[in-house]
Amino acid sequence: MNPFVYIRFLVLTCVLFALNSYVAQFQFNYNDSIPVIKLGNTLKFPWAGGINYAQFSELDYDYDGDMDLILFDRSNDQIRVFEHRVQGAAHSYKFNPYGDALFPSDVRYRMFLADYNLDGKNDLFTYGIGGVKVYRNAGNSGVGLQWILEKNLLYSDYNGMYMGLYVSSADIPAIVDVDGDSDLDILTFSIAGDHVEYHKNMSKELYGHCDSLIFVLKNKCWGGFREEVTSNAITLFDTGSLCTTGNVPNPQLPVITKPEEEEKAHAGSTLLAVDFDNSGVLDLLIGDVAYGNLNKLMNGGSNPNTNSQMVSVDPNFPSNSVSLNLQLFPGAFYLDVDFDGKKDLLCSPNAKGTSENEQSVWKYKNQGSLTLPNFIYETDAFLQRDMIEHGIGSVPVFADVTNDGLPDLFVANYFAYKPTLLTESRIAYYKNTGTLANPVFTFVDNDFLNLSQANLGFRIMPTFGDLTGDGRPELILGLEDGTLRYYPNQSTGASPVFGAAQTQYQGIDVGQFAAPQLFDLNKDNVLDLIVGEKTGTLQYFQNTGTAALPTFSLVDAALGGIDIVTSTPDGFPQPHFFRWQDTTYAMIGAYDGKIRFYDSIDNHLNDTFNLRAFPFLGMELGSFSAVAVDDIDHDSRLDLYVGQDLGGIFRLEHEVGSNLSQTELVEPTITLYPNPTRNDITVNASVNLGRITLLNLSGKCILDYTCDSMHCTIPLTDVEQGVYLIYHAGKPIGRVVKL
């Protein structure tokens, strides 16, 4: 087998099968032009989608000579790109909504960018099965960002046994030059979770350069300390069987005996290794899965490779400023984020689902120097303070509750972190303080109607509509228990006033996690009620009463044949029906983070609706997608607002010339990378790929591969060197691509 397969991005003009397919010409583009104001400040990234559990790195993403900020969010493995922009002497970040498309699709659990081969381009380290996977940065200013899978899994010599270099999926290791020889070594907690292992990169010693990733375990107790198994307490100068003191020449592995106690599964730790005191050896910041602080360990040595011991520990780091207390499982990241040439410290939690998720990026500004940093607390919401950000699973809803003719913005959520009871679901309120043509959303209240105090469970889902005939919208809430709450609008002026809740509204109970929408579905000029429920269907309650006295009667328990099926038994559909040019459409958000777009609804309420696009616009938002569609700025173009797992909102605008009633022939786009490749190739498409076949130039089938998404990585380790064709036989079109 030849480990090198040559890839060429060339789309052939021949098509094996003419599978002409017509799809709606319905395109939206990201647009952040509507301002959002909070506490008197205009937000810089209002529509950037939010942040939950961030890991930060830097990368010259666009090869323009400066470092851009790359954010990996452990909440469903999402990537955000903030490009470094320079205008005169002013430096700033600009959110790139499409930046994640140029990263490998299999980045999981963690992502760290660092230049392992000293070519001036940061490479990508992520999770491999039980360890570390590495992509080499093969891009340039001409071809753009490209990645080559360099190592599917890093290996290390464990005292004569060559095994996968173990790093728990929960952990963030320190990938850093420990010994000062310019190649990147790895510090990581052992599988027992109490000692830090030092895996030395032997590239420089073996080959005289840094472009290899060959590791040897040199120390099972680097720094000579132990972290307690039942807490995050640190024992310095550990005298246990794994640890020794004294010099370790060049270094050599200390004498190691098997621990008497049985190793326990490692729960989770984060490491940042930095020389804080310019002593020549690395110190540590350690985060633990069950705690909100960082332990700062200072190294008492002055020369690398001498097995120097950690001599002090500060559990209140930074003790000279506001000590970190960030629930839960904080990681620390060392990079310059304010463009002054000095690396700052960012901290963010990593316990998915149980950590702080609204004010979850603490920034400590470096007011010292590069060699002697001095970290001073600046904010607990770096980037987040400039976004719409409301925990996990944001849901955008518009309603004019101030009776001024301008739609206001409400953002519900699945839950937000709460220190006492851990989570709460609530609704934020942004008043529209602009005009019809130029809306401006101004933050008013993080907990509209104090709903978080009502103990309504997870994921309260609002919908507004006039149910009394007075022109003012009432509020209906869908609840976790499957029932609805009704809040009458009692306002007589410009301020929203809602009366006491009516529980179990009209006896409606859909089981669990009711997601209601008030909408005149049958065009009889009275509002009907569509309710999504946890398992994936929509229930249609027709208004058989009047506009001022509605009676909602169940007509269809599986409206349109819609049944949201995801990777779990739960669909969590969030229905949003809307009307454009007197035609009804539906977009459905769901647990899988994708959006389903339906048409053929009018005159077909008893039939199965047509699934026109899935996933709509190719968007994959991690989980809990939610949509709202309306022409908010009255420019005769629809706006699309998308809620998502990370607690913020994306805003998109209908493309000029794109018309929902028109159709055109659209071929899916298919791209391949890297070029060349040694092991795998990633296929990206604008449609779900389905079956992919690898053919040689004689037409012989070399490999069949099934992919149920728009992005797949195909292993080519058993493919001989040569030129190949990829045939995509999935709908809507067959295509041949030369490899």
Please provide the spans of the model-predicted regions.
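C-terminal tail/sorting-segment detector
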Residues: Q721-L739
